[in-house]
Amino acid sequence: MSQLKTIFKWYEAWFNSEDFNGCMFQKALEEVIKIYPSTLEPATKYKIWLTTLIQGLLTNIGIRNPSHLATLIVSILDGMTIQAHINRHSVDMDEYWMRVEHLIAFEKALP
């Protein structure tokens, strides 16, 4: 669980850094893909890498079917990134993390 929380702490530090301007992969998919379709591949590879990393961490803490929860957590991270880009001080990481812990506890309780 601590490794997964470290990812969230990394995002928090990134959001609060002076040079934070949102996610280049999100920007590539939203803004640049029509002009430069080649931006799709690195953005997709990054998303697959992050999802796979989180799936492995969830497996390590006893989640039997981690793929859906990993995808949901990546979506939460994406949403936080967009929110931080709009207003970097609006992301309360402790609140997000508490909800992720609830999701993990829910998944662990499934039969």
Regions found by a protein language model. Give the residues of each.
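Amphipathic alpha-helical segments used for helix-helix packing
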Residues: 17-36
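Hydrophobic/aromatic-rich alpha-helical bundle segments in the mid-to-C-terminal region
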Residues: 40-46, 59-107, 111
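Hydrophobic alpha-helical connector segments
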Residues: 1-17, 60, 70-73
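A non-catalytic, amphipathic alpha-helix used as a structural packing/dimerization or gating element
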Residues: 6, 42-52
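Structural signal for well-ordered, non-membrane alpha-helices
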Residues: 12, 51, 55, 101-104
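Short alpha-helical scaffolding segments that buttress acidic/His motifs in well-ordered protein cores
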Residues: 8-11, 25-29, 73, 77-80
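Short alpha-helical transmembrane interface motifs in multi-pass membrane proteins
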Residues: 8-9, 37-40
